[in-house]
């Protein structure tokens, strides 16, 4: 959960007793539970029927099973080393959301949620289903975040009315930004849903790599790249004009049995990724995977890691995780300059490349 939760997870628990930490956990969990309840839809977003929601995995469950150890995975919280939330995750609750029903979850995504889909090049149908699942998951995520910010405003108002006058602009800015995110996710949802029953495509593949070993990371999502390989601006995330649309890069990292599929694709109508696409195409596989590795750890928090990774590797990965934030600003030009610097894919940052064979894990037959 971005925004509020990142700030909470970065909050120092030094000096707190175990009992106080437990109490904070209870309050936060109730806060999240209430937000999810308020954001809850009445009907399945895919079929429109009111028959309850299932635990829908963003990343295919079989991929998570390939890197789990005793059914457990490391998550973003592991790198934050949070004392407030659990540092590991079970396969059953890793990256789940509740916005579609079980029949839809079991039928709509069949083409991409099976290992056979990646024995060769993934089909257009599979890629479209990945995009649809990404949009659904982010709609759920951002709508919940909006309710969390609304609840935080109310809590602040009740606790300290004077202070709330100063922090309300920050909350309101976050809410506006999240509402824009939701609308853009719905745009992707509508496009991908409309292509479910056709062989045509709206997708352009940026890269597809099939490795002959299992990488210790699983990820599926869409990223609004701020800057490309040359430092060029791709998305101005601080431009809130109604006619400005964020262009997303979809990424899937699927650990298979003794293999890994790594996919990047975009909307074929996107124009701002042209330079990035050219650079990616000109790179060696090693260079390309290094860039993808950096994108994951500089931009996202929704990846899952094998618990077989050693402590030194986890420790090194903690630094970019702790820097991940959801900034709010009143100076868009300055913020864009800072963002281009912060997300520079060329900058000197020591990150273990989890796509390297040295980090590969063995999967059970």
Model-derived regions: residue spans:
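Non-transmembrane, interaction-prone segments in cytosolic or luminal domains
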Residues: 28-30, 55, 59, 66, ...
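Generic detector of well-ordered alpha-helical segments enriched in charged/polar residues
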Residues: 22-25, 29, 128, 132-137, ...
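Context-gated lysine
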Residues: 7, 26, 33, 37-38, ...
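Low-complexity, intrinsically disordered regions enriched in charged/polar residues
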Residues: 2-3, 18, 126-130, 160, ...
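An N-terminal structural lobe/cap that precedes and organizes the functional/catalytic core
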Residues: 2-121
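Internal, well-ordered alpha/beta segment that forms a basic, Gly-enriched binding/recognition surface
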Residues: 73-176
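Charge-dense, low-complexity intrinsically disordered regions
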Residues: 175-365
């Amino acid at each position: 959960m971005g925004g509020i939760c990142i700030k909470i997870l970065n909050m120092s628990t030094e000096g707190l007793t175990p009992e106080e930490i437990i109490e904070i956990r209870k309050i936060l969990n109730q806060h999240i539970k209430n937000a999810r309840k308020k954001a809850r839809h009445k009907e399945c977003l895919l079929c429109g029927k009111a028959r309850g929601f299932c635990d829908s995995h963003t990343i295919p469950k079989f991929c998570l099973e390939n890197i789990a150890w005793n059914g457990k995975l490391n998550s973003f919280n592991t790198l934050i080393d949070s004392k407030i939330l659990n540092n590991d995750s079970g396969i059953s609750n890793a990256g789940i959301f509740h916005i579609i029903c079980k029949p839809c979850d079991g039928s709509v995504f069949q083409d991409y949620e099976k290992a056979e889909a990646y024995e060769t090049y993934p089909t257009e149908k599979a890629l479209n289903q990945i995009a649809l699942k990404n949009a659904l998951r982010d709609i759920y995520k951002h709508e919940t975040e909006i309710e969390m910010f609304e609840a935080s405003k109310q809590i602040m108002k009740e606790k300290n009315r004077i202070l709330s006058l100063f922090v309300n602009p920050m909350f309101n800015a976050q809410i506006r930004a999240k509402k824009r995110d939701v609308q853009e996710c719905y745009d992707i949802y509508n496009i991908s849903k409309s292509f479910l029953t056709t062989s045509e495509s709206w997708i352009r593949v940026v890269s597809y790599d099939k490795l002959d070993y299992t990488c210790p990371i699983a990820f599926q999502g869409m990223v609004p790249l701020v800057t490309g390989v040359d430092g060029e601006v791709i998305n101005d995330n601080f431009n809130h004009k109604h006619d400005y649309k964020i262009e997303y890069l979809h990424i899937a990292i699927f650990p298979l049995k003794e293999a890994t599929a790594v996919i990047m694709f975009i909307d074929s109508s996107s124009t701002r990724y042209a330079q990035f696409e050219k650079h990616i195409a000109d790179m060696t596989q090693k260079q390309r995977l290094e860039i993808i590795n950096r994108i994951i750890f500089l931009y996202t928090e929704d990846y899952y890691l094998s618990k077989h990774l050693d402590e030194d590797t986890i420790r090194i990965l903690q630094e970019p995780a702790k820097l991940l934030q959801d900034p709010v600003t009143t100076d868009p030009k300055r913020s864009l300059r800072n963002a281009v610097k912060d997300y520079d894919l060329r900058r000197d940052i020591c990150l273990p490349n989890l796509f390297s064979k040295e980090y590969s894990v063995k999967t059970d037959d």
